[in-house]
Amino acid sequence: MAMAKNVVVIGAQWGDEGKGKIVDWLAEEAGGVVRFQGGHNAGHTLVVGGKKTILRLIPSGILHEGLDCFIGSGVVVSPEALLGEIDELNAAGVKNVEGRLKIAPTCPLILPYHIALDQAREASRGKGKIGTTGRGIGPAYEDKVARRAIRAADLLHPEKLREKLDAVLAYYNVQLQYLHNAGPVKAEDVMAVIEKVAPRIAPMIADVSRVLNEKNKNGEKLLFEGAQGALLDIDYGTYPFVTSSNCLAGAASAGAGVGPQMLDYVLGIVKAYTTRVGSGPFPTELFDEVGAGLAERGHEFGSVTGRARRCGWFDAAALKRSIQINGISGMCITKLDVMDGVETINICVGYELPGGGKTDILPCGSDAVETCKPIYETMPGWRESTVGVKSYDALPANAKAYLKRIEEVCGAPVAIVSTGPDREETIVLHHPFA
């Protein structure tokens, strides 16, 4: 049987682009949905039939009855957050969540000492805060790279786990007590958490890499669900105001345990304007009533943290960088309806640099981006409502012109347009699985 076509969905901006809705929509055709990086530091919001669900760790395909979902080894897993999410889904009537969810044995676990250090560090930074969610993501990735992580497979061997834990806590408690003036974390408290979660987590641990490769050989389509956004990538984002993982399409290969030849189509999710949460440079940020209007109409508050998002004009130069580093096959433009009624629209097509130079692509690193002054093209907006429009031809002429100009400046085609939060409020120009 021929190998199935597989799709990677990534955020192409600074996160919060609307990936959850699109993954949920694409999951109709998938045989499996896979998370491959990040942790429970970002929420994916899904609206089905007017009912809202926020997922943080579990793939957005879980609402589809009978669909298998996977958490690959690139994800750092908080057992308590995971079980809390499962309990929420069970209470909402979602069937057989634990039976359909598989976790790679190689996933690093987020435990109480990660959270303690994450929060103590951020408190110590004062004005230099990075904007971490304080959920232990960064310290858990540090442990992975430093080869001291306690991983999902360790839950199957509690006698060996205690030895590892004692060694890890010796390292953590020195930092907590002497660098951050915080209290130590007790091994007994961590073991109490582990003993509570292990019986439920253990049955979900499986060789995710093998299962995914078998599914692909059997002709099942796979959907890889990214978290955060490409401009928050640890290597290519506005460092150090970034997340702790690789958020790019290429990370799906390593983070899920599949070969790169299995990644057939990369769908970049792109908001019709730009937002950013927390600290870091943002060249097109708006500080006027237009920005406030976008925030209000777009409900721009983090689904996990509740933090207000900063809003700005569409940044095509930043998106160019994202298209380049991800190999984006097509774009899904979300929240087009939020732009309804904006009289004049600006698109950033490049930046003026110190010394008189210009560039048409976002530089790497926050120091370089801080110095960028946006170069704008102006377009007329539209007064008509695009809310819930399901046909491209039914869009206002100026909305279509806006989408066309985004394609021209960025160099990638628009495949999908989202005109509302519900699964059905979607215009399809090219189906990624086609």
From Swiss-Prot:
Chain positions recorded as GTP binding sites: 15-21, 43-45, 309, 335-337, 418-420
Protein origin, superkingdom: Bacteria
Catalysed reactions, as listed in the record: IMP + L-aspartate + GTP = N(6)-(1,2-dicarboxyethyl)-AMP + GDP + phosphate + 2 H(+)
Keywords noted in UniProt: Cytoplasm, GTP-binding, Ligase, Magnesium, Metal-binding, Nucleotide-binding, Purine biosynthesis
SMART domains per record: Adenylsucc_synt
GO CC annotations on file: cytoplasm
Cofactor: Mg(2+)
Active site: 16, 44
UniProt function note: Plays an important role in the de novo pathway of purine nucleotide biosynthesis. Catalyzes the first committed step in the biosynthesis of AMP from IMP.
Name of protein: Adenylosuccinate synthetase
